[in-house]
Amino acid sequence: MKKHLIKLLVLILALATGAAVRAASTLDIYWIDMEGGAGTLIVTPAGESVLIDTGNPGGTNTDSSAARIHKAAVAAGISKIDYLITTHFHMDHYGGAADLAALMPIGEVLDNGIPEHDSDGVTNNDARWTRGIQPYRDFKADSRKVMQPGEVIPLKQTSGAAPLSFYCVGTRQRYPIPSYVPTNVTNPVCAEGVEHPVDTTDNANSIVMLLKFGPFKFFVAGDLTWNMEAKLVCPFNPIGTVDLYQVDHHGLNLSNNPLLVRSLSPTVSVMSNGSRKGAMPETLATLRSVPSIQTMWQIHRNTLGGTNFNTDYQYIANLPVQCEGNYIKCSVDPSGKSYTVSIPATGVSKTYATVLDRPY
């Protein structure tokens, strides 16, 4: 009898500990410090996980991209990546995948299809490209699939929580207009656009995703660059406005076209930058010029400058160059009507109301 009681107490404690890891029925998003790479982990109310990009290669040591993703996954209470989305084939976005697969199982991999030649079309670079991509090609996963525009990730719904959907707005420079988007009136901001030189790198092919949780909307587009950002929302905007904007391309000025940011009109932005990469003054100026944005959050302080390179320091997860790899977290209420962004390591947090009166 005593042994059974002890087992019961252990089970109750384990369940209580698991519940403390992630509040029931919240949608949680983690921006993990990839030291200038990208890695965004989404954990659904049903406990499924979606990882967008895996940072750089670096083995499985404590400070590697894979180890930091694994650490965040453990904090989120998950033991498997159900879906891995690789937005494009640059090393700082796919490089940590093979290392991560050595630490935890990976379910379905979705990407643009592994190129046979250099992803940026660089001539005489095929040998180097082949060596660099081989670990990604070889790592173990349950399945692999080429992402298509309009594709929906079949995430599980949860009783008592808002409806959840996650779909591909576009990829490989194709952005179809959904039938519910009105096409009788063009996007008014498009008239003010300025083109940049054509981007021939794989950045321009980045997968663009939109997450909806009830009224809450989150936009993430890898390293999508200037002209493609304009093409995405002009002449028609298939996305509408969003609550949360993952700043494109680490905050570089090759991206974050004002046409895109103004069309999305986010309430919050989160930037996955490095201490000397991204967070460019032009991007910060664009974000500050958008009236809807209440707070700009950053993974790193940009050491190249002061306020023109950075948001308010309290909203930066890692201030020193030699840092602890702190992440930024967003927890969305089960109703989808409010959400809290925080830096758990510093205790800074801020709660926002979701925009409710959108046409779509």
Feature map (PLM): residue ranges:
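Flexible, acidic/histidine-containing loops and adjacent segments that form or flank the divalent-metal
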Residues: 24-27, 94-225, 289-360
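Conserved beta-strand hairpin/beta-sheet module of binuclear metal-dependent hydrolase folds
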Residues: 24-80, 202-226, 230
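Metallo-beta-lactamase
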Residues: 81-92, 245-249
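Active-site environment of divalent metal-dependent phosphoester hydrolases
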Residues: 36-38, 58-59, 89-95, 115-119, ...
